Curated annotation (Swiss-Prot):
Keyword Cytoplasm appears in the UniProt entry: yes
Protein name (record): dTTP/UTP pyrophosphatase
Functional summary from the UniProt entry: Nucleoside triphosphate pyrophosphatase that hydrolyzes dTTP and UTP. May have a dual role in cell division arrest and in preventing the incorporation of modified nucleotides into cellular nucleic acids.
Family to which the UniProt record says this protein belongs: Belongs to the Maf family. YhdE subfamily.
InterPro entries: ITPase-like_fam, Maf-like
Site entry: Important for substrate specificity: 12, 70, 152
Keywords: Cytoplasm, Hydrolase, Nucleotide metabolism
Compartments, record wording: Cytoplasm
Cofactor(s) for this UniProt protein: a divalent metal cation
Pfam short name (any one): Maf
A Gene Ontology cellular-component term: cytoplasm
């Protein structure tokens, strides 16, 4: 059985793989998350996921390596991870009472074999009251997530509707990822 590496420091992606009974090691990548602004959104997340996986695979040539990347797009603008609370507040106010799209790209590499895909989901936020927004910002939950919220945590209180896969919004579309991992003979460890 091949070693399976998650090229991510995301505690959410790690937790999702654990709850699905995958055995893996975590090896964060050190990749600049820059991209050509003319790229399509699905191209951005696929390319960044591939770069993350490739940077880890370069040091672990016999391992199956999974990289992932997520972006939030609202009115044509990319919302990455906020640099500070003020930026998080600006992002969340923009998302208030509107719909945005979350794109997640996944890349799985093993030697010369590569499988890269993306998925998208639409998320609609309720109108954010100043009180709810301030409580959320005080929690610290906004600073390490694209778009300044985590749908799988405290940020769920803002969401009124999802069109698409919840796990795509959370950062790792599990059903599609599981099918892709099977192509590399990586399966949940049930026994």
């Amino acid at each position: 059985m091949n070693t399976f590496l998650l090229a991510s420091s995301s505690p959410r992606r790690s937790e999702f793989l654990k709850q699905c009974h995958y055995q893996f090691f975590t090896q964060p990548s050190n990749v600049e998350e820059t991209f050509d602004p003319t790229w399509e959104n699905d191209t951005i997340v696929k390319e960044l996921a591939r770069r993350k996986a490739a940077s880890v695979a370069a040091n672990h040539p016999n391992a199956v390596v999974l990289g992932a990347d997520t972006i939030v797009v609202h009115n044509g603008k990319h919302l990455g991870k906020p640099a500070n609370v003020a930026e998080a507040k600006t992002m969340l106010m923009a998302l208030s009472n509107s719909t945005h799209t979350v794109y997640t790209g996944v890349a799985i590499l093993h030697g010369n074999k590569e499988h890269v895909f993306s998925d998208a989901a639409k998320v609609t936020f309720d109108e954010l009251t100043p009180e709810r927004l301030e409580r959320y910002l005080q929690s610290g939950d906004s600073l390490d997530k694209a778009g300044a919220y985590g749908i799988q945590s405290f940020g769920a209180i803002f969401v009124s509707r999802i069109e698409g896969d919840f796990y795509t919004v959370a950062g790792l579309p599990l059903s599609k990822t599981a099918k892709a991992l099977e192509k590399f003979h990586i399966y949940p460890n049930i026994g």
